[in-house]
């Protein structure tokens, strides 16, 4: 890391997966503080050989898939926010007057579990790999929720995991992103600033580009990839369920060197609450988890001026800076 990169890097704490799995009390308190102060943290996965191998397997799949022609990938399009292919430039980008510049392949957890007919052909063809990855990412994020519930001594009805029952439908989704190499900037840029919709995001990426809006010092800071580590962040739902104790940090994706000089790949598992879970959202509104999801995706596609007119895009967090 260069001296300038070090200056521009966000400080995030690093937690150990194996210590959280074993319900280590000290690690649990570090987890609570990370969620309260930063809303982001690194999770060291190197104790879990299977998860590291699955990461490599999904990256290999992405390298093959995203190199297909656009016509071939569009066969997987489902015009959905939770499954299928989505081409570049469908939402507002990270800079004024430009759209986003990423493409994605998504797989809904519920539909993968049931092998739904809605699954994109590319997901069906790689069902075993993607199903296992989703199982493991889901297990890790649910374990984190349980540790937070223990730390806060929540009663059964208020435990965070109680809003994520296996028997209930949810919009939890695996999303595989490619930010294509760019020759010119005017085609689009990055991924616009936002807070995540759901409860927790489990992110795997080996390349720079993710930025978090820091409170001290105020400004955008790059999240440096660490070998063998996931980046975990708090989403709006966990912020709402915690009574705003936990922080859903504003973040974006933007090229480090103005243009995206090489393809950038990232894998995100978005843990989301069951669809009918009731949330006390921004402005004192009461909404279901599904309605918050749908409303926020609608805002992603609006103009920058329309996005600035309410607090949905950044979950009200930008006002707290």
From Swiss-Prot:
Fe cation binds at residues 194, 196, 251. It is an enzyme of class 1 (oxidoreductase). 2-oxoglutarate binds at residue 264. Its EC number is 1.14.-.-. The keyword Ribonucleoprotein does not apply. PROSITE patterns: FE2OG_OXY (PS51471). GO terms for molecular function: dioxygenase activity; metal ion binding. Keywords: Dioxygenase, Iron, Metal-binding, Oxidoreductase. It comes from Dothideomycetidae sp. (strain 11243) (Fungal sp. (strain No.11243)). This is 2-oxoglutarate-dependent dioxygenase frbH. Belongs to the iron/ascorbate-dependent oxidoreductase family. The gene is frbH. GO terms for biological process: small molecule biosynthetic process. Transmembrane segments: none annotated.
């Amino acid at each position: 890391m260069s001296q300038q990169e070090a200056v521009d890097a966000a400080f995030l704490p690093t937690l150990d997966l194996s210590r959280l799995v074993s319900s280590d009390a000290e690690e649990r308190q570090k987890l609570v503080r990370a969620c309260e102060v930063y809303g982001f943290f690194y999770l060291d996965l190197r104790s879990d050989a299977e998860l590291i191998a699955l990461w490599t397997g999904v990256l290999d799949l992405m390298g093959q898939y995203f190199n297909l022609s656009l016509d071939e990938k569009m066969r997987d399009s489902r015009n959905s926010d939770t499954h299928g292919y989505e081409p570049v430039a469908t939402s507002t980008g990270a800079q004024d007057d430009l759209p986003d510049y990423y493409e994605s392949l998504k797989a809904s957890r519920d539909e993968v579990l049931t092998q739904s007919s809605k699954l994109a052909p590319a997901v069906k063809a790689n069902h075993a790999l993607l199903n296992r990855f989703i199982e493991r990412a889901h297990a890790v994020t649910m374990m984190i929720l349980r540790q937070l519930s223990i730390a806060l001594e929540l009663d059964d009805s208020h435990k965070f995991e109680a809003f994520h029952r296996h028997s209930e439908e949810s919009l939890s989704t695996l999303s595989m992103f490619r930010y294509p190499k760019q020759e010119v900037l005017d085609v689009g840029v990055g991924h616009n600033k936002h807070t995540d919709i759901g409860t927790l995001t489990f992110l795997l990426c080996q390349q720079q580009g993710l930025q978090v809006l820091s409170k001290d010092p105020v400004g955008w800071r790059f999240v440096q990839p660490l070998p063998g580590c996931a980046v975990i962040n708090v989403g709006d739902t966990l912020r709402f369920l915690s009574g705003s104790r936990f922080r859903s940090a504003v973040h974006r994706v933007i090229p480090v060197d103005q243009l995206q000089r090489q393809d950038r790949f990232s894998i995100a598992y978005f843990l989301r609450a069951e669809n009918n879970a009731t949330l006390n959202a921004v402005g004192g509104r009461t909404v279901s988890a599904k309605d918050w999801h749908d409303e926020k995706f609608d805002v992603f596609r609006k103009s920058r001026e329309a996005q600035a007119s309410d607090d949905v895009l950044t979950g009200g967090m930008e006002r707290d800076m």
